[in-house]
Design a protein with these regions (language model features):
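N-terminal, motif-rich segments that launch catalysis or mediate targeting to/interaction with membranes
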Residues: 18-124, 133, 138-252
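Sec-dependent N-terminal signal peptides
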Residues: 4-15
């Protein structure tokens, strides 16, 4: 029994912590832009109405074999030469299809609160994912996971650098980082747009990311200096758009 527990802990630590601070930051930022009616509706659905906590639920559930079929929901891989609209869609679903489905389920009065909780938690997570450019990267390198780099001398990969490494370098909690973003950025010039436009934005960014890094590169302070502002803006934008999406669902 002890060995099984140790094995479970090790597997969990290897598979599921990536991006936790970023996702929770996005959820925390979103809370500041929710209407009162939206907050009330969310509280009816979730036992814990914190969007920050809800944001990592879908990653935490990946250890459950029943949830593996939802793994394709977290990304949409396509060649850089074509847009999502012109790409071949996966029969297993992708991040855009999953966002559309989640929104539809949350608007449907015939859907139970239990089922709505499932789709709400996924929606909170996926709107964060779609604003991380490597989640719409190339299929051939699994969104940068197969581009191996050195991060301050340690083994990493391009996807992890954007998901986790740059954020962790600042050693902020998600509450500290969200407070910093809310002080630093304004929602005034951010358009809410749609998931189809979000993925186009991220694809434009990922083209630049790919062009600046190759397999085996050493990344450190220079890379943070050149790119971390993009990470912060994406986290803030994702939070604002998450709130806008939820307000549209629950308060319009």
């Amino acid at each position: 029994m002890k060995n099984k527990f140790i094995c479970f802990v090790l597997m969990s630590s290897l598979l599921f912590p990536w991006g936790k601070t970023g996702h929770r930051t996005t959820g925390e930022v979103a809370e500041h832009f929710l209407t009162e009616k939206t907050k009330i509706e969310i509280q009816k659905i979730l036992h814990d109405p914190s969007l920050a906590i809800a944001s990592t639920w879908s990653d935490e559930m990946r250890s459950n074999p029943d949830f593996r079929k939802y793994n394709p929901w977290h990304y949409a891989n396509m060649p850089l030469s074509i847009t999502y609209a012109n790409s071949k869609k996966s029969s297993k679903g992708d991040i855009v299809q999953a966002i559309k489905l989640s929104k539809s389920k949350l608007k449907d009065n015939n859907v139970s609160f239990e089922e709505k909780a499932f789709y709400l938690k996924y929606l909170v997570h996926l709107i964060g994912d779609i604003h991380q450019p490597l989640h719409v990267g190339r299929g051939e390198d699994r969104g940068g996971n197969d581009i191996k780099v050195k991060w301050f001398g340690d083994d990493s990969n391009l996807h992890r650098v954007w998901d986790t490494n740059m954020i962790d370098n600042y050693q902020m909690s998600y509450t500290e980082l969200s407070s910093h973003l809310l002080r630093s950025y304004s929602s005034e010039n951010i358009e809410l747009l749609s998931e189809n436009e979000w993925i186009d934005e991220s694809q434009n960014k990922v083209k630049i990311i790919y062009s600046n890094v190759k397999n085996g590169d050493y990344l450190g302070y220079d890379y943070i200096y050149e790119n971390f502002d993009i990470v912060k803006i994406q986290l803030f934008t994702a939070g604002y758009r998450l709130a806008g999406t939820l307000n549209e669902i629950f308060d319009e």
